[in-house]
Amino acid sequence: MLQRVSRRFPSLRRCGLRTASTVPTNQAQPGEVEEEVSATVKRIRSELAADKQKLKWRTPIGDRPEDWNSKLKLFSNAEQTSDFIVMMQKPIDLSPRNIRQWWENREERIERHMQQFVPERHKILGAELAAAHFILYRGGAVKFINDTHWRRASKDGEFKLPNKFDPRYKVEALRCDNMELYYEGLENLRCLDSLKFLSFHNVKSFDDWCLDRISGGGFPNLEVLDLSCTQITSNGLACLYRFPKLKLLILNDPKETLELELSTVMLEEAMPALKIVGADAIHS
C-alpha cells in the first residue's frame, strides 16, 4: 500500500528530500571539521612558540644589538664558564705561588684532555689492547692471560704490543699504582671480561666518582681490587655490588672512621665471599 501511495505522490517524495536536506543537524561537514582542526593546530603551535620564546634564556651581555662591543672580542672565550668569570673578577696576582698554581691547573686540564676516550683507538685495537696501551703509556703494568711476567714500558716509554686487534691478548691484571689517572681516563678501561686483578694503589685523584665509573666498566670476573691510598670514602663502597665475583678488597684502614667500618661490615654481609683488609697487611 505504501508503494502505491509513493507512486501516486511523487511530488511529496521530492519535497521530503528537499526538507531533509535543509533541516539543521549537529554533525559538521568533513570540510568544516578539517578547517577547525587545522585552525586549532595552528593556534596551539603559535602558543607553544610564544611560550618557548618566553622561557628562552636571556641573551648574553655583548650579543644584544644595543651592547657596545670591543674589537678585542675576537680573542674572547665563547664558552665562558663560572671559573673563567671568577678568575676575571679577581685582582691580578703575579706571585710565584699563584703562577705555580696556575701552571699546575693548566697541566691538569691538558692531561685530562689527553686521557679522554678515543673511539677510533678501541675500534682498531679492541678493548683489551686499547686498555693495555693506555696503562703502559702512563707508567702502569699489564699482565695478559698465559703470561708469566708483568709487562711495563721501558725508560723511553716504549713497549711491544700489537698495533691492531689480536684475539690472543686478554688482560688478566692491571696495575695503575702511583699513576696520574683522572676520571676522564677511566673510560678507557671497559669490557675486560678476563680481568681478575685491578690496583689503584696511591692514585691520589681516585675518588668515589672514579670508583662508580670503574664499577660500571664491565668486569664480571674481577676478584681483587686495591683502593689503598686513594680518596675513597664510605659513600663510594656501595657500588661494589656490581662485582659479583669480588673476593678481596684492599683499603687504607677499614676502621678509619665509624661510617667506613659500618659500610665494610654491611658490604661483607651482602657479599659473603668478599674479604676486606687494610693496606698494612698487603703493602707492608
From Swiss-Prot:
InterPro entries: LRR_dom_sf (IPR032675). GO terms for biological process: mitochondrial respiratory chain complex I assembly. GO terms for cellular component: mitochondrion. It comes from the Eukaryota. Gene3D superfamilies: Ribonuclease Inhibitor. Associates with mitochondrial complex I assembly intermediates during its biogenesis. Involved in the assembly of the mitochondrial membrane respiratory chain NADH dehydrogenase (Complex I). Belongs to the ATP synthase subunit s family. This is Distal membrane arm assembly component 2. It comes from Drosophila melanogaster (Fruit fly).
